[in-house]
């Protein structure tokens, strides 16, 4: 069934107006609606300017973090260079898409190198599973910088994006039909297409932690759908993209080897943002130190000369591993501890005391108890343990069956974690309060504002009308309890939109049956 929400057809309409209009026409023929979005930066008059966009460049630019819409009204040469213009409009388009995410059903872009660099960041900002197609002259080469770790469909334009002809009309028409098909008959990623209805877990794995991860996955598969990510840099980023998209219910980040590459300088880093989405998600997470005994390089000849004196292990013809040192492990521990200390959900860090990989055990090439000890002790020193954030030491190697059992046990434990509320502090949760005395509205609001200013939590209750007016004026609600009648009266058919002002977007709503 076709979505009632429009598809965005995005391009620099100062130079690609006819192409965007053609794609829009093809989409309309499929029964879908479309909005043409202009992200051009030039004001040079051209034959394309008679094609009017549905969303102007000025409107898109108004969503730039700097909100400097006037900048794009100037000729392109007012920017320091063309790259600055592309960056500016790319950032603005990200803001536009994020702000209007619920108002469109898919996004299709067209462009050369500049247009592709401008449009794809907004696509990467959208959740996995959201329809996104990019027709590009760059799609026959290395598309990693454009795609990142998300599911952008890249289509090579074959001919340059310069007018409608026998070749471009077919390619662009197919791209338009591809987009319409995704929107009309796409799969709901949260439920799959006739797939599992089990909660989804994300888990990181490497070849040298496979026995552990396989055992954990098999133990949990009756209750969960476990999606495994190869911790090769892109794998870690993909996991965190799914986490930030709200598509997983828990995390088993057992193989954190990408941190070693980030800290030391290997080729499989997931970047300095590794773990950010995980610790900020609030999701239950069991984390471990899988494969932190190694830094990854390509073939032996690719290892930088500065590491020639180090312990190297040729994993295969394309992969060479370098054993991490005591000092490097302390730095790795500092990186991980800093991230863990920012966690807002239940998180357990499991330390495999007898080895972090299949080659970090007695008799294997990377066994180094001193280096491992430095890693473990630094983590114990730096991680700020709380009721929800704990370190658990396991007296075995990571691939021993005991470790997998402990990982499963800890995950089940933290998924049933309950916050214990202390209701004995009268300053924050009074148990004896005077009966409410009706009074003039202005007087009530004055008292309300005084309480808000004091920083105390506020619980509001009612059918909706009264508390809505009060919180609209001052805001600061922590908890609002409403009756069904109030929900219908204020928002219509269960919607809370009318009840919740933007400034109270973080307030918690409870419905009384």
What annotation goes with each model-predicted range?
Residues 423-462, 473:
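N-terminal amphipathic alpha-helix/helix-capping segment at the start of soluble metabolic enzymes
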Residues 6-8, 15-35, 268-428:
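C-terminal non-catalytic interaction/assembly regions of soluble proteins
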Residues 2-45, 106, 115-125, 129-134, ...:
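N-terminal phosphate-binding or glycine-rich loops at protein starts, especially the Walker A/P-loop
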Residues 377-381, 443, 493-513:
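Alpha-helix-loop-beta-strand connector modules within alpha/beta enzyme cores
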Residues 16-28, 35, 45-54, 195-237, ...:
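Glycine-rich phosphate/diphosphate-binding loop of Rossmann-like nucleotide-binding domains
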Residues 109, 118-147, 156, 227-231, ...:
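Short, acidic/small-residue loops that bind anionic groups at enzyme active sites
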Residues 78-142:
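N-terminal glycine-rich phosphate/adenylate-binding segment common to multiple enzyme folds
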Residues 48-102:
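Phosphate/nucleotide-donor binding subsite
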């Amino acid at each position: 069934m076709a979505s009632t929400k429009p598809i965005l057809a995005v391009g620099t309409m100062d130079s690609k107006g006819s192409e965007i209009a053609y794609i829009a026409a093809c989409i309309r023929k499929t029964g879908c609606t479309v909005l043409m979005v202009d992200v051009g930066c030039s004001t040079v008059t051209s034959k394309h300017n008679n094609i009017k966009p549905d969303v102007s460049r000025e409107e898109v630019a108004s969503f730039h973090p700097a909100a400097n819409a006037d900048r794009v009204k100037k000729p392109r040469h007012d920017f320091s260079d063309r790259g600055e213009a592309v960056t500016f409009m790319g950032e603005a388009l990200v803001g536009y898409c994020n702000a209007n995410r619920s108002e469109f059903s898919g996004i299709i872009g067209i462009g050369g190198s500049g247009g592709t660099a401008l449009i794809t960041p907004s696509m990467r900002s959208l959740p996995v599973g959201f329809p996104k197609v990019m027709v590009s002259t760059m799609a026959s080469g290395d598309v990693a910088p454009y795609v990142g770790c998300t599911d952008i469909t890249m289509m090579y334009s074959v001919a340059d994006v310069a007018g409608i002809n026998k070749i471009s009309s077919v390619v662009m028409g197919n791209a338009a039909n591809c987009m319409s098909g995704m929107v009309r008959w796409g799969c709901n990623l949260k439920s799959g297409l006739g797939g599992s209805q089990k909660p989804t877990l994300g888990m990181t794995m490497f070849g040298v932690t496979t026995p552990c991860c396989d055992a954990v996955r098999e133990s949990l598969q009756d209750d969960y759908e476990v999606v495994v990510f190869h911790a090769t840099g892109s794998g870690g980023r993909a996991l965190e993209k799914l986490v930030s998209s709200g598509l997983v219910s828990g995390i088993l980040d057992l193989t954190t080897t990408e941190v070693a590459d980030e800290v030391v300088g290997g080729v499989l880093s997931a970047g300095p943002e590794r773990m950010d989405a995980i610790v900020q998600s609030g999701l239950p997470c069991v984390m471990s130190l899988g494969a932190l005994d190694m830094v990854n390089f390509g073939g032996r000849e690719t290892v930088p000369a500065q590491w020639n004196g180090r312990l190297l292990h040729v994993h295969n013809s394309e992969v060479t591993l370098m054993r991490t040192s005591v000092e490097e492990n302390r730095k790795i521990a500092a990186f991980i501890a800093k991230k863990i200390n920012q966690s807002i959900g239940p998180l357990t860090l499991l330390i495999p005391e007898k080895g972090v990989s299949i080659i970090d055990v007695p008799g294997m090439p990377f066994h180094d108890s001193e280096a491992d000890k430095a890693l473990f002790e630094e983590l114990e020193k730096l991680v700020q343990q709380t009721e929800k954030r704990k370190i658990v030491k396991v007296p075995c190697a990571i691939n021993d069956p005991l470790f997998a059992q402990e990982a499963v046990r800890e995950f089940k434990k933290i998924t049933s974690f309950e916050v214990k509320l202390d209701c004995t502090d009268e300053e924050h949760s009074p148990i004896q309060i005077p009966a409410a005395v009706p009074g003039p509205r202005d007087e009530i609001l004055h008292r309300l504002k005084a309480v808000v200013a004091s920083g105390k939590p506020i619980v509001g209750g009612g059918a909706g009308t009264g508390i809505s007016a009060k919180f609209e004026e001052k805001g600061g609600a922590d908890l609002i309890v409403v009756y069904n009648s109030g929900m219908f009266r204020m928002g219509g058919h269960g919607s809370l939109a009318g009840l919740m002002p933007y400034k109270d977007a973080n307030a918690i709503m409870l419905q009384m049956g």
